[in-house]
Amino acid sequence: MIELIEININNPFNNDLITIDYLNKIATINNQSYNVKPGYLNYITHTLTYWQNEYGTKNGIDIEEFTIKVYDDNKKITTFHGKGVYPSNYQEFKTIIKEPNYEWKRKIN
């Protein structure tokens, strides 16, 4: 089971450190804490899995990059890193954490 996730985003517009404490259902964005609804934790996990699959193996030369560390209950750390990429839904991801009544729309192609 996931206990904690750390997300570090670096690009010219965002230098964010996000932590998500699954046990206490608290997310922190640059030292500002937010309570996270349990259902949103599933969305967060789904989004991070998408980022890992879509961006996590890229190794470009751009200044945009992200690193995500996932800590499980056995204290195992899984890390993935994307460089030269930037998750397209990152701003919405932050909005979902910050605004507890935000309703995201799932895009189906």
Which residues does each predicted region cover?
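Short, well-ordered, aromatic-rich surface patches in folded extracellular/luminal domains
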Residues: M1-N10, L23-I26, Q32-N35, W51-N109
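Well-ordered beta-strand positions
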Residues: T19-D21
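Generic short beta-strand segments
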Residues: H46-Y50
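Long, charged/polar, surface-exposed segments that mediate recognition or autoinhibition
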Residues: K37-T45
